[in-house]
Amino acid sequence: MIGTDPRTILKDLLPETIPPPELDDMTLWQIVINILSEPPKRKKRKDINTIEDAVKLLQECKKIIVLTGAGVSVSCGIPDFRSRDGIYARLAVDFPDLPDPQAMFDIEYFRKDPRPFFKFAKEIYPGQFQPSLCHKFIALSDKEGKLLRNYTQNIDTLEQVAGIQRIIQCHGSFATASCLICKYKVDCEAVRGDIFNQVVPRCPRCPADEPLAIMKPEIVFFGENLPEQFHRAMKYDKDEVDLLIVIGSSLKVRPVALIPSSIPHEVPQILINREPLPHLHFDVELLGDCDVIINELCHRLGGEYAKLCCNPVKLSEITEKPPRTQKELVHLSELPPTPLHISEDSSSPERTVPQDSSVIATLVDQTIKNKVDDLEVSEPKSCVEEKSQEVQTYRNVESINVENPDFKAVGSSTGDKNERTSVAETVRKCWPNRLAKEQISKRLDGNQYLFVPPNRYIFHGAEVYSDSEDDALSSSSCGSNSDSGTCQSPSLEEPLEDESEIEEFYNGLEDDADRPECAGGSGADGGDQEAVNEAIAMKQELTDVNCTPDKSEHY
């Protein structure tokens, strides 16, 4: 392959894709390798759709793989990473030289300064938390001989506390620690005292003057390979599994994210998670708080599973999306109307850009103020902070320069019709509609879940949003007559796109050394082309292209 131009290969793989000229050959080769090594995408089975199908599978299957992530430990009280007062924020205060929060998981930074990591370690160290209902459900499946393997991305060791025996800790855990120099290994209890006293634990066997003789918990850091145990187990399990259940994971961290595409495609797959995973095709999607969903499944399974239930009430199913409450409708009516302009060549109203940018800023600020004020009165602080961050996005409209030639109002004498709707104008047109979004699950009463045919269920806690016309007032929507589709936000069936998926595509380019042997396969389909198209467009905007597991996945 020496002397071969990777652009030639990319042209053959993706004929309609033209990589930007500024991408170097190394990056292009990484894209080629990523495409060729990606397992083919699985298609949903048409004969498995309902929660009844899921329960039947749980009753009949004997070799179940359960893949778990952050969602199974949310209810255990483990500290949050990203909130205003979370671990990341406090580390930034205590360690101002920390370049970014995730640097504490970088092995090179750890060698230079292990203190940030050990401050974090104290907060989630084993022995402080109890297993969730999800952990207990998996442990009972293990006890009954139904569990083939639990692959967890978490590092909290709660699987062991729950009694799960057939466990693979994909990203390591705090259960043991080993010396960076001599690899001497000890149990977590041997270094507990030092960690809770905020003393960097030292190796008892290495010379005292050896600066790197540090007892590091055996967590997979950036720059380290996954445990060999993961690869060996996956090589065997992929041919034995008869059901895959994903619980509480976004599946954006490779190689674990490749598991659903690496097992035989006829094996049924069930998702239990707060949000959908649009890059994968599950047969049944149970969306919401993981413990709430597992509680309902335990009711339906009966026997020993019913004894695990935290909530004695079995939920009732509804098939019609609940309407907005009167309070929500009143709030929506307070959104400012989008200015309209009747163009000379169209009978339908077209929204235009106010000619004074101060008008935009005023409208946005007023709406933001109303939105935040309402949140502060009606919702807990954590919810206010989360939604305020979303609302803050729309302050960026203030920076739009309406006199910029790239930003043309409808009716402008310059530019053709296709240039009238610029990116900035699209943002302006859509911001009221985005403000109007809210979680469908918040409309459910305490004993309901919503069935969205053919295979999606919305439980409490589901991060699935609605913006359909029957939910929003006409003054706050983008309109239904647009042919361009630029204003159409994702509907109930289409969750908001997460740019981290694009980032994860690039993260995955460099992690081939960590890819399990079972993740073979070749070929590029439409999904590959779309991913590459988006990825190369975002390349210059990405600042972190680490390839090893993202520890924030645990939270």
From Swiss-Prot:
Disulfide bonds: none annotated. GO terms for molecular function: bHLH transcription factor binding; caspase binding; deacetylase activity; DNA-binding transcription factor binding; enzyme activator activity; enzyme binding; histone binding; histone deacetylase activity. Methylated on multiple lysine residues; methylation is enhanced after DNA damage and is dispensable for deacetylase activity toward p53/TP53. The keyword Cytoplasm applies. It is an enzyme of class 2 (transferase). A motif (Nuclear export signal) lies at residues 241-247. Its EC number is 2.3.1.286, 2.3.1.-. InterPro entries: DHS-like_NAD/FAD-binding_dom, NAD-dep_sirtuin_deacylases, Sirtuin, Sirtuin_cat_small_dom_sf, Ssirtuin_cat_dom. Binds 1 zinc ion per subunit. Zn(2+) binds at C179, C182, C203, C206. Keywords: Acetylation, Apoptosis, Biological rhythms, Cytoplasm, Developmental protein, Differentiation, Metal-binding, Methylation, Myogenesis, NAD, Nucleus, Phosphoprotein, S-nitrosylation, Transcription, Transcription regulation, Transferase, Ubl conjugation, Zinc. GO terms for biological process: angiogenesis; behavioral response to starvation; cardiac muscle cell apoptotic process; cellular response to amyloid-beta; cellular response to antibiotic; cellular response to curcumin; cellular response to glucose starvation; cellular response to hydrogen peroxide. It is found in: Nucleus, PML body; Cytoplasm; Nucleus. NAD(+) binds at residues 69-88, 153-156, 248-250, 273-275, 290. It catalyses: N(6)-acetyl-L-lysyl-[protein] + NAD(+) + H2O = 2''-O-acetyl-ADP-D-ribose + nicotinamide + L-lysyl-[protein]; N(6)-propanoyl-L-lysyl-[protein] + NAD(+) + H2O = 3''-O-propanoyl-ADP-D-ribose + nicotinamide + L-lysyl-[protein]; N(6)-(2E)-butenoyl-L-lysyl-[protein] + NAD(+) + H2O = 2''-O-(2E)-but-2-enoyl-ADP-D-ribose + nicotinamide + L-lysyl-[protein]. The modification N6-acetyllysine is found at K46, K185, K238, K321, K417. A motif (Nuclear localization signal) lies at residues 39-46. Red wine, which contains resveratrol, may participate in activation of sirtuin proteins, and may therefore contribute to an extended lifespan as has been observed in yeast. Calf histone H1 is used as substrate in the in vitro deacetylation assay. As, in vivo, interaction occurs between SIRT1 with H1-4, deacetylation has been validated only for H1-4. This is NAD-dependent protein deacetylase sirtuin-1. It comes from Rattus norvegicus (Rat). The lineage of its organism: Eukaryota, Metazoa, Chordata, Craniata, Vertebrata.
